[in-house]
């Protein structure tokens, strides 16, 4: 079964926030993505609300519940108490925990599972008790994956930024794919499902899914939004789904 596509709406929200105006509509483009076949929507609300606003979360939850009940809502973020309160309020199907500093422009590394498993364990338990699937952002290095499995995580999301950066270097792309494949196989052996995200595009997805056929989901924002400016959201989503096939 092909990996599912979750459309990250942060870039849409960032464009909206350049003006004190309600467009482009985050929920409007989310609706277009889901209508075109996306399996879910992803957001990463940061404390300063520089792209996704806290008020967007209820709107997206309502959009999915009212119009696309088969779709999933994925909320990413560092597990501060404020973040945990947000996800417990809006009940996404999946919570993806990332080790970001709040001032970071974007997620650029995974968790150190060896040193942070004691911090993460009660958070994972709390979210799972609330009925949410939990994924942890992970570097493509299997060191410590057994710690992630031991604390009850459902999935790891492989950080694909270094792979995305090899768009003009085929040899480097092959090396990064080797790392990702090895990491994915190690996670699968531990009973973890695999997500992936960061700098994925129509061009680099086919090689990734060929190497990791067990991939459950990709969340894509920047590249997909850039393509949507050229082709429109419905056509763009269709192209990404085809790239995952």
Curated annotation (Swiss-Prot):
Pathway: Cofactor biosynthesis; pyridoxine 5'-phosphate biosynthesis; pyridoxine 5'-phosphate from D-erythrose 4-phosphate: step 5/5. The keyword Cytoplasm applies. One of its GO terms (cellular component) is cytosol. Its EC number is 2.6.99.2. It catalyses: 3-amino-2-oxopropyl phosphate + 1-deoxy-D-xylulose 5-phosphate = pyridoxine 5'-phosphate + phosphate + 2 H2O + H(+). CDD domains: PNPsynthase. GO terms for molecular function: pyridoxine 5'-phosphate synthase activity. 1-deoxy-D-xylulose 5-phosphate binds at residues 46, 51, 106. It is found in: Cytoplasm. 3-amino-2-oxopropyl phosphate binds at residues 8, 19, 199, 221-222. The active site is at residues 44, 76, 198. One of its GO terms (biological process) is pyridoxine biosynthetic process. Pfam families: PdxJ. Homooctamer; tetramer of dimers. Belongs to the PNP synthase family. Catalyzes the complicated ring closure reaction between the two acyclic compounds 1-deoxy-D-xylulose-5-phosphate (DXP) and 3-amino-2-oxopropyl phosphate (1-amino-acetone-3-phosphate or AAP) to form pyridoxine 5'-phosphate (PNP) and inorganic phosphate. This is Pyridoxine 5'-phosphate synthase. It comes from Brucella anthropi (strain ATCC 49188 / DSM 6882 / CCUG 24695 / JCM 21032 / LMG 3331 / NBRC 15819 / NCTC 12168 / Alc 37). The gene is pdxJ.
